[in-house]
A protein has these predicted regions:
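Bacterial N-terminal signal peptides
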Residues: 42-53
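Extracellular/oxidizing-compartment recognition motifs
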Residues: 59-185, 268-586, 594, 610-611, ...
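Extracellular, modular beta-sheet/disulfide-rich ectodomains of secreted and cell-surface proteins
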Residues: 183-268
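Alpha-helical support elements that line or immediately flank enzyme active sites
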Residues: 288-297, 302, 469-487, 517, ...
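Active-site acid/base region of carbohydrate-active enzymes
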Residues: 297, 356, 363, 367, ...
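Non-catalytic C-terminal accessory modules of carbohydrate-active enzymes
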Residues: 358, 375-377, 381-407, 432-443, ...
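C-terminal capping/lid segments that line or modulate ligand- or cofactor-binding pockets
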Residues: 395-402, 587, 605, 649-650, ...
Length: 1004
């Protein structure tokens, strides 16, 4: 073919393809050979590629991503989105106003886009030949800039397809529960004795145990509760059972908190079993992709080694609608000869784990597949999940270290005495590639203090609230000694939420306890069963959460605000487990609609696109199939809430589009979001929705001050009705904006027409003319009426004045809002430029407010302003967005989403003297720094290539504004637009800018 410069080059067009050598490729890919193959085909044809370039230095595409990830393994998008950044070079500072005008993408063997005239460098859809399951694709891109220069080709990147069709799977679903053997046959309990080990007391419990036999199976956790009483309080006891099973006599025993099962080979749903398969290889494979599809939790092992750092995977889904699979490159783990593939399973949110896995390899020229079936073997690991994973009882783990087998996944270990797994029917749901980031250990935290409590137990303090687990090294413990660990987020009163682990010692000179398949929210660990205090250096906690890519940074002259920023980040990390943001990690662990209040805070700090895309799907999956009403929690539940909680599905959809410019999420969810709106409308009479459902189905603003769970002084019913009516109007406008994105203009117009009809009806139903407010003289109700257009135009100044009086006078600079009210208050005041009011609110140090929490020693945000109940909660995590979008002023533009056009509108408020902030947008790093000295302001702004910006420079007059030492109006690439609310507004292209101005006397 001939390219646009008249240069001839060869290009491969066969199904097979060539891999470019890329030394910078991610570690999982460095081992792959130059000649690649499809794992669906045994033969390979290789073609040569020659791409001569005569490029002009200046721009270069870098940071190539496919489906928002670098070199992803196992994607399932048939037309994946490809993205890149534009890097400038050759001059310092970098040139201004750099834009891409065209691009060309080459995907080896399957697609040459040709030169495409477009400035799009994000979410470019693949347009080549149909993609093949298991195939690796190599791609590169070059771009043309607005000076007519063509770049060098980018360094190559890759993506690897996952399973695209159900028929790609040959692996069978397996379970470690004994299937047909679950009916044990004829089991008779001959004698059962519950006795103290020291002989202090003995009880005959034969009758009790006999009643616990179900379908020929006895499967219990030994304890006084299930056995009818405690014959020897505070003494260690055993249950000894003699039985007859199918005519054969036997005996068994187990201690308190241990599991006793007859038949002995039976594994329960609460077990965390080992599952394995051995196989032989004649040579090390040139490629080996493992695809693991588990409902529950798992860890993957090959030849005794854990594969990768991921934990507690996969992410949780609605198991009635879909499951997730993950893909691994196993070449570094395999060897010639005998190999062993192992899965360590646990139930997670399921009653018991089920799994399927297949490993596709190329050994020499021969394809080979290992897949789960009934020939795989399993046994107990000695780990059992404690607790029912229910409200206020998420439990923990029982670890019997005497059963620990560190060589369970070693190929030389015999599994002849292991039990066979059971093949089970395949769930009638699709399996999809996991797109959200995996969970990992994010930080190790040493214990800072150990004290002996009045009850004789030992208390470890880690100095901060966290979500994770304890690592405790034990020395000189007798075999069978049981250590119990409780976890608390508050000491006065002690608040554990039934979180506990039990560890039965193996009796080794040194051993270590650490959870694997459950976690806790805590600051303190209380240890029972130790004769002497633990050594402080032997105790660590590990923070666990989603391994988000960091996308932002903020610091300023106020140490109080810097602390708030760090606490906000830490709180979000403490809530980021299992593919959704939970309300709290200990009491409920549910994906409540609370998560919508932290959307902007999360997106400014982290890469959230795949995470929120997945979570928005969970809301759609959970919608009522008859009405379309979205649940209050997703993907797990149920939980209490109201129309606003189900609205989280739409909020996630819209913000994901606004921040990342991907229309696919809107296409997927728009109709489901409309059904949710329509479901709310079924409860309307005369244009006003009235309370429906029970107490926990129509909540308005959750836990404002003095209206929390400790007082039961909930807002009156009309307040919840007004709040939810306003929220339903908010959903309508947001939905109309999404419909416009897809070109559904008529539907958007119809939605707004109905919105305009409803606004005066809601006003008439709730406005008190005499008192001049809606329902209550509280900030949430002024705010919601203003934000949603319920207030008639002629009343807006008066209602805004009442809101300001409520903040400044009635509440003396404090807020009186709850979770949703706080979120909307911050967004609304920032939108209308009242950052002075936000500064007043945020910098308060007494109750209620974030400063009050800090003064009381909070290391994560609480559920209620006064600290009642949960100490790690999502309610007030909306704060951080103001630091980025208010103080630094970095905001997306709805007209050009994904930060294709940037708004920089900083707030110079209070006694703040400087701000340093950046956000790594899809197009590159945006920087907004400012410093004031008296009334002199210096702003430094960086806008990434291929974008434009509107920059608001706080200034007394535009004529006094300079840029890089010149009058701003004369500076290259700077265009004055207008004066607006005490700021000179400029249009700029990419590049670095330094503005200086004289601040107005009054600034907001």
């Amino acid at each position: 073919m001939i390219d646009d410069r008249g240069v001839s080059h060869q290009y491969a067009t066969s199904e097979a393809h060539v891999v470019w050598n890329n030394p910078s490729r991610a570690p999982y890919h460095t081992h792959l050979p130059m000649i690649h193959f499809s794992r669906r085909f045994a033969s390979v044809v290789v073609f040569a590629l020659v791409f001569p370039c005569f490029a002009v230095a200046g721009v270069l595409p870098v940071g190539l991503h496919c489906e928002s990830a670098g070199n992803p393994l196992g994607i399932d998008a048939q037309h994946p989105n490809l993205s890149w950044l534009i890097e400038t070079s050759g001059t310092n500072p970098s040139p201004r106003g750099v834009k891409q005008t065209a691009y060309q993408i080459l995907v080896a063997g399957v697609w040459d886009s040709g030169k495409v005239a477009s400035d799009q460098s994000q979410n470019v859809g693949y347009g080549g030949k149909p993609l093949v399951s298991g195939q690796r694709y190599d791609w590169k891109v070059r771009v043309w800039d607005n000076s007519g220069n063509v770049s060098e080709w980018s360094k190559p990147a890759t993506w690897t397809m996952g399973m695209l069709k159900p028929e790609d799977w040959t692996a069978r679903w397996i379970s470690t529960q004994a299937g047909a053997a679950k009916t044990g046959g004829k089991l008779t309990i001959l004698k059962a004795v519950y006795k103290a080990r020291d002989g202090a007391a003995t009880a005959d419990v034969t009758a009790k145990v006999s009643l616990l036999v179900k379908n020929g199976v006895l499967d219990i956790e030994v304890g006084s509760g299930i056995l009818g009483g405690d014959p020897a309080l505070n003494h260690v006891k055993d249950l000894a059972v003699e039985y007859e099973l199918n005519g054969a006599r036997g005996s068994t025993s187990a201690g308190d908190f241990e599991r006793l099962a007859i038949p002995k080979s039976l594994l329960s749903g609460t077990d965390a079993p080992y599952v394995r398969k051995t196989f032989d290889l004649t040579a090390i494979p040139t490629s080996a992709l493992a695809t693991v599809n588990v409902m529950g939790f798992y860890e993957l092992y090959v030849n005794g080694k854990k594969v990768g750092p991921n934990i507690l995977g996969p992410a949780l889904t609605n198991y009635g609608k879909r499951s997730l699979y993950e893909t691994y490159d196993l070449v570094p783990y395999l060897r010639k000869g005998r190999n062993c593939f192992g899965l360590w399973l646990s139930r997670g949110w399921r009653d018991s784990p089920i799994a399927r896995m297949q490993l596709d390899m190329m050994v020499g020229s021969r394809p080979l597949r290992i897949a789960t079936d009934g020939e795989w073997r399993c046994k107990s690991s000695g780990r059992t999940i404690l607790g029912p994973w229910q409200w206020n009882n998420m439990g923990g783990e029982l670890v019997d270290a005497r059963q620990d087998d560190p060589r369970w996944a070693d190929p030389l270990t015999s599994d002849s005495d292991w039990s066979p797994v059971s093949e089970i029917a395949a769930p009638a749901i699709p399996a999809e590639a996991q797109k959200c980031p995996p969970m990992r250990v994010l930080k190790t935290i040493p214990a800072i203090a150990c004290t002996k409590r009045a009850d004789g137990n030992y208390q470890l303090d880690f100095g901060t609230q966290l979500t994770g687990w304890l690592k405790l090294r034990l020395r000189g413990q007798a075999a069978g000694n049981t250590i119990t660990i409780e976890y608390a987020d508050k000491l006065e009163p002690l608040q554990t939420f039934s979180q506990l682990d039990r560890y039965i010692c193996a009796g080794k000179p040194a051993e270590e306890f650490c959870s694997k398949f459950n976690y806790h929210g805590f600051r303190w660990a209380i240890i029972k069963g130790l004769a002497t205090a633990p050594v402080l250096a032997d105790a660590e906690a590990e923070l666990i959460g989603a391994d988000f890519e960091t996308r932002g940074g903020f610091t300023c002259s106020s140490e109080q605000l810097n602390r708030m920023h760090q606490v906000n980040l830490w709180t979000i990390q403490c809530l980021s487990q299992s593919g959704f943001l939970s309300d709290c990690p200990h009491r409920e662990r549910l994906g409540y609609g609370d998560g919508q209040v932290s959307i902007e805070s999360c997106m400014m700090n982290f890469m959230m696109q795949p995470f929120y895309s997945k979570w928005s799907t969970d809301w759609v999956d959970g919608a009522d199939p008859n009405t379309g009403y979205m649940p209050h929690t997703a993907p797990n539940g149920p939980g209490g809430g109201g129309p606003a909680w189900g609205g989280a599905g739409q909020a996630l959809t819209w913000r994901n589009y606004l921040y990342y410019q991907d229309t696919r999420i809107v296409e997927r969810n728009l109709d489901a979001c409309r059904r949710h709106i329509e479901a709310i409308e079924t409860h309307a009479k005369d244009g006003v929705v009235r309370a429906f459902g029970g107490q926990w189905d129509f909540i308005g603003d959750w836990v404002p001050p003095e209206r929390g769970m400790d007082t039961n002084n909930w807002p009156p019913k009309p307040a919840a009705e007004f709040f939810n009516n306003c929220y339903r109007l908010y959903l309508r406008e947001q939905w109309a904006q999404m419909a416009e994105v897809l070109g559904r203009q008529d539907e958007a117009k119809a939605m707004r027409t109905e919105l305009a009809r409803l606004q005066p009806l809601v006003h008439a139903a709730f406005y008190d003319k005499d008192k001049q407010f809606y329902v209550l003289d509280e900030q949430s109700y002024y705010l919601m009426s203003l934000m949603t257009g319920v207030v008639p135009e002629e009343l807006r100044p008066a209602i805004m004045k009442k809101l300001e009086e409520c903040i400044r006078v009635t509440r003396k600079g404090h807020l009186d809002t709850g979770m949703l009210g706080t979120y909307f208050l911050m967004n609304y005041l920032m939108e209308i430029g009242r950052n002075d009011l936000l500064w007043l609110i945020v910098t308060q140090k007494d109750y209620p407010g974030w400063g009050y929490m800090l003064e009381k020693g909070a290391t994560t945000w609480w559920e209620q302003w006064n600290g009642h109940w949960s100490q790690i909660h999502s309610c007030f995590t909306s704060l951080d967005a103001w630091f980025y979008q208010g103080l630094a002023g970095i905001r997306p533009d709805t007209a050009k989403p994904g930060f294709k056009h940037v708004i920089v509108k900083p707030a110079v408020v209070g006694d703040l003297t400087w701000v340093k902030c950046h956000h790594d947008s899809p197009y590159g790093r945006i920087i907004s720094n400012w410093k004031r000295e008296g009334q002199q302001l210096t702003m430094e702004v960086t806008i990434p290539p291929n974008t434009t910006a509107t920059v608001h420079v706080p200034a007394k007059v535009d004529g006094a504004v300079t840029e890089s030492g010149k009058p701003a109006a004369e500076a290259k690439g700077v265009k004055f637009l207008r004066m607006e609310h005490g700021a000179a507004v400029y249009a700029v292209g990419s590049g670095f800018y330094q503005f200086q101005s004289i601040l107005p006397e009054t600034i907001r």
